Amino acid sequence: LDALIAHGMDVARLNFSHGSYENHALLIKNIRDAAKRAGRTIPIIQDLSGPRVQEGTSHHLDPSAVEVITEKDLKDLDFGLSQQLEYICQSFVGSAKDVEQLRSEIFARNPDYKLQATSFPKVMAKVERKEALDNIEEIIDASDAVMLGRGDLGKDIPIEQVPFAEAMVVHHCKEKKKPIIVATEMLKSMVDNPEPTRAEVTDIAYAIILGADAVMLSEETARGKYPVEAVTVMEKVCLEAEKFEREVNAL
């Protein structure tokens, strides 16, 4: 964690599809201790599972699910609030109603939550289904931030449409001044290899040039062989993309 922070990690995401509360609590403590040693603040995102079914090692939306927020999510939310996590991210949102339901659940557990506009936790919507794309503007309006989960989205729409969905979501988030994280398989090859592919580097740069506020690693840092190298590559590409933007804007 010390090395990840030193090489460019700004936010940590905890995937509540996996792991025990005991393991998550230890990881939260370790993240905060490492951030303190570095003189940094590292916000933590609690990524709720949502209505998933598992096939082998992958998860996807349960099509029979009526409610996006499950009983497991509510138990996980209680844990996240007890740990004072900075962001709660709801998976598989389809409309503003799903986001508002999560906010209501937070308010029910902490009546003072609504009284402070700057208070945590912030509510993040994960966009990863066609219905969310159809309702993207109302979802952004209802959320404090958005995460684009391209993996599950690519199962719900034709995969060739994913880059254009990404551009559309980022555009609307920038227009409405809401932070947007682009996620999934950004440096997938670095799970097993110390260097990225040219296509992966281009993918990261594309997201930044579109206007994404953050790009996210998952497997690369959760179970990959080269987590620090992956963060280092991502940091370098982001800085180059931002430099390019400044040069273009100066013309």
Residue ranges and their predicted role:
Residues 1-251:
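Non-catalytic helical/linker scaffolds that mediate oligomerization, partner binding
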